[in-house]
From Swiss-Prot:
<protein>
    <recommendedName>
        <fullName>Glycophorin-binding protein-related antigen</fullName>
    </recommendedName>
</protein>
<feature type="repeat" description="GBP 4">
    <location>
        <begin position="230"/>
        <end position="269"/>
    </location>
</feature>
<feature type="repeat" description="GBP 6">
    <location>
        <begin position="308"/>
        <end position="347"/>
    </location>
</feature>
<feature type="repeat" description="GBP 1">
    <location>
        <begin position="109"/>
        <end position="149"/>
    </location>
</feature>
<feature type="repeat" description="GBP 8">
    <location>
        <begin position="388"/>
        <end position="427"/>
    </location>
</feature>
<keyword id="KW-0461">Malaria</keyword>
<dbReference type="Pfam" id="PF02526">
    <property type="entry name" value="GBP_repeat"/>
</dbReference>
<keyword id="KW-0677">Repeat</keyword>
<feature type="repeat" description="GBP 2">
    <location>
        <begin position="150"/>
        <end position="189"/>
    </location>
</feature>
<feature type="repeat" description="GBP 5">
    <location>
        <begin position="270"/>
        <end position="307"/>
    </location>
</feature>
<feature type="repeat" description="GBP 3">
    <location>
        <begin position="190"/>
        <end position="229"/>
    </location>
</feature>
<dbReference type="InterPro" id="IPR003681">
    <property type="entry name" value="Glycophorin-bd"/>
</dbReference>
<feature type="repeat" description="GBP 7">
    <location>
        <begin position="348"/>
        <end position="387"/>
    </location>
</feature>
Amino acid sequence: MRISKASNIESTGVSNCKNFNSKNCSKYSLMEVQNKNEKKRSLTSFHAKNITLIFGIIYVALLGVYICASQYKQAADYSFRESRVLAEGKSTSKKNAKTALRKTKQTTLTSADPEGQIMKAWAADPEYRKHLNVLYQILNNTDPNDELETSADPEGQIMKAYAADPEYRKHLNVLYQILNNTDPNDEVESSADPEGQIMKAYAADPEYRKHVNVLYQILNNTDPNDELETSADPEGQIMKAYAADPEYRKHVNVLYQILNHTDSSEVETSADPEGQIMKAYAADPEYRKHVNVLYQILNHTDSSEVETSADPEGQIMKAYAADPEYRKHVNVLYQILNNTDPNDELETSADPEGQIMKAYAADPEYRKHVNVLYQILNNTDPNDELETSADPEGQIMKAYAADPEYRKHVNVLYQILNNTDPNDESS
């Protein structure tokens, strides 16, 4: 009995041990499988996350490229549309400018006005502004070096009443507005309008209207035959009526005689401007009438005595009648324009004859340069085909820059215009 029990106990223990070992073994093997599965799952999850991340990066990159390409395309389309609109705008503006140029009227300031000739270089070139300012100073009779000039200089026209009389300054400003073709009250047709200076005799005299209209065409660079010529071309102002009208040719020839100081009558000396008052002058009341009209305009006197607000008569100030100095200088200008000098035999400093030097008769070069001025005034250029016909600067030939002689003669003309002569005392 004891032995059997012992053997039973032993066998039971062994079986229990075996059962315990088998359980542990299965448990450990299950854990290993679970660990392996977890590792596989984590590795798979890691790879899946990496793949998802890579695809996300690729998607973001492609999306960025697409957005950039879309924006670039929009910018390119906008730039193309903008350039096309600008080109169409420039083309339209050019067409409108040409159309407005051809429809220019006296009462409007269109692109045919000389203001259109003030190029971009105006704002960029202080030298050009300086010289224009000098001209403005001359027109306004102001000279910073007035004490250094002679009494025959236009600076002598700066009267005491000038500084004290705002009315005179106002009227000089009107002249400046007229010369610059700018009128702040243009639509109102006020006294600043040059049309106001066309007196009653203008409407009654078709001959005078014709000649004034020619001058107006020249000053405004407009041509009724505009379609045949370029609208900006001063040459277009030499109209068909010029060649067909001997009356107008005669008057222009008189001006040419005055500028060149030559007399076809050969009665006077060729250097004497008095010789330019030809026999036809005294015999032709028509020409005398037109010169008298110019004198009336320059002296601001009108035989009609209407004294309209637009009339230059408004410029006759109280100081004018009271100041003999101003009257004297205006009379000097009248003498110069009419080429008559009461002191001719004395050869005074106010006499233009004193400015015609001895070299004038002996120097054919001077005559050549005066002819250049005549070409400029008549808007004709012998070298027109070589230069741009619309460009007045094209009349300043290459010889200008290379020829100091020409500069000297131009200075002589400047002296004449300013009524100062470096050889005045020796005349």
